[in-house]
Regions:
Chain B
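A generic local structural motif
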Residues: 4-7, 87-88, 122-126
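Hydrophobic "anchor" residues on beta-strands that sit immediately upstream
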Residues: 17, 99, 136
């Protein structure tokens, strides 16, 4: 086992890695927005463009860890999740991906594109009636993206796009909290709450808002421009605790 | 009249939660059952056990390729399981005015978290949703063959090179103050 490093030394290591002027540092971009906002389409276009520009890109999606996703999936199937369990299981899935996917890629200098980030948990859980402060605690130590693109749509547009091809499922429609049997009606009510929470988070956490009612190409070229500007941002010191905790874990695992 | 000896009998009230925490599952379950046995039969609701939701059973199925969970991930899952127990077992029993024992409850998780080096403040916030028990008991058992802490150490040791016995020893030290602070 490698020698144990104290917290101060781990902080120095983290800063040296992410502020090294000679190399391309890891960069984290989050795509956020209500269902039907078109963010997944934009995320794919953005990834293709980044790769063409020579970036090494890793994508991570919401609720996708090999460890926790099957647990969530089986419980969603039988509609067995209460708001707290829903929130805690998604936070566990997120934490596992931070430790096994996101941090290793950032450490290696890659661009990580997150199709939904912790803000999805915050918006949905608060829309389910949970306390924002408690939900935020679940995601500690916080890892802040370098850029958060928030795809803003109205509840009507979101509902129209989602229901055009399918019926929203039980949790997507928020039927666990709306007590409405009609999935479309429930979806509209729930997504209205989710969007309201997103709008608050956008102000608090300084998201870059993209008008998702624009054409696909307009949005894509806007993202390129925003990345060219934002890509030069210095590393956020706020992230040092998250990096240090991961480094400590990694050294234990080595 | 002879003075009554200090009793260990459970004081029965409407809806009473008793927490029993410790390292060894068999011992805390036995202690919880002993406590409940002192309660009139019609008021007993039973013992709420760790992993009633089956989250940790399912975790084992995921296998090693999924990556070893950290202590933080395991505690988020413990909290999810506890939320399930509260929703389906503990709160309904309390609402019916019964006596229910939770074995283990919050103190076991706090002790493991502290032993694994997690901040006390985060742990306290994480379990903020769990009601305080009317009585908090701690079982100072000698073995650590089964239960959450044993399981968690086993999961961590898959990849982390953790020495399970060190975590168990540290958890034991943390357990008593944690249990007391929840009273």
């Amino acid at each position: 086992m490698p020698p144990r490093l104290d917290n101060r030394r781990l902080r120095e290591l983290a800063r040296a890695r992410f502020t090294n002027p000679g190399g391309r540092r890891g960069f984290l971009v989050a795509f956020e927005g209500a269902d039907g906002s078109g963010k997944t389409t934009q995320r794919k276009l953005f990834k293709t463009w980044l790769k063409a520009e020579g970036f090494d890109v890793v994508t991570t999606k919401w609720n996708s860890s090999d460890l926790v996703k099957p647990i969530i999936k089986s419980r969603k199937a039988v509609q067995a999740l209460g708001p707290e369990e829903f929130s805690l299981l998604h936070a566990a899935d997120f934490r596992h991906r931070v430790e096994h996917v996101i941090m290793p890629a950032l450490w290696d200098g890659k661009v990580v594109i997150a199709d939904r980030f912790l803000f999805t948990g915050l918006a949905r859980d608060v829309a389910r009636g949970l306390d924002l402060d408690w939900v935020l605690q679940l995601y500690q130590p916080l890892l802040w993206p370098d850029l958060v693109f928030y795809f803003a749509v109205s509840a009507d547009t979101s509902g129209r796009r989602v229901t055009a091809t399918r019926t929203p499922n039980f949790y997507e429609a928020g039927r666990d909290v709306t007590d409405l049997d009609d999935p479309v009606e429930s979806y509209h009510r729930f997504v209205t709450r989710v969007i309201r929470e997103y709008e608050s988070l956008a102000v608090i956490f300084n998201f870059i808002t993209i008008d998702a009612e624009q054409s696909m190409s307009q949005q894509h070229y806007q993202l390129r421009e925003l990345f060219r500007e934002g890509g030069k941002r210095p590393w956020s010191e706020w992230n040092v605790d998250a990096v240090v905790e991961w480094l400590a874990l990694t050294r234990q695992r080595a | 009249m002879a003075r009554a000896h200090p009793t260990t009998r459970v004081k029965v009230r409407r809806g009473t939660l008793i927490s029993v925490d410790g390292i060894e599952a068999a011992e805390i379950v036995a202690a919880a059952r002993a406590r409940l046995a002192e309660v009139p039969r019609q008021r007993r609701a039973g013992v709420s056990l760790w992993d009633a939701s089956g989250v940790f059973d399912d975790l084992v199925v995921a296998g090693r390729d999924a990556g070893a969970p950290s202590a933080r991930t395991l505690l988020l899952l413990y909290a999810a399981d506890l939320a399930f127990r509260l929703r389906w077992e503990i709160r309904p029993a309390l609402a019916e005015g019964r006596v229910v024992a939770a074995a283990p409850y919050v103190a076991t998780a706090l002790a493991f978290g502290r032993a694994a080096g997690l901040p006390a403040g985060w742990l306290k916030q994480l379990f903020r949703f769990a009601p305080r028990p009317a009585q908090a008991c701690y079982v100072d058992g000698s073995s650590a063959r089964s239960g959450f802490i044993r399981f968690a150490c086993g999961q961590l040791s898959l990849a982390n090179g953790f020495l399970a016995q060190d975590v168990v020893a540290r958890a034991r030290k943390h357990l008593k103050p944690s249990a007391r602070s929840r009273r």
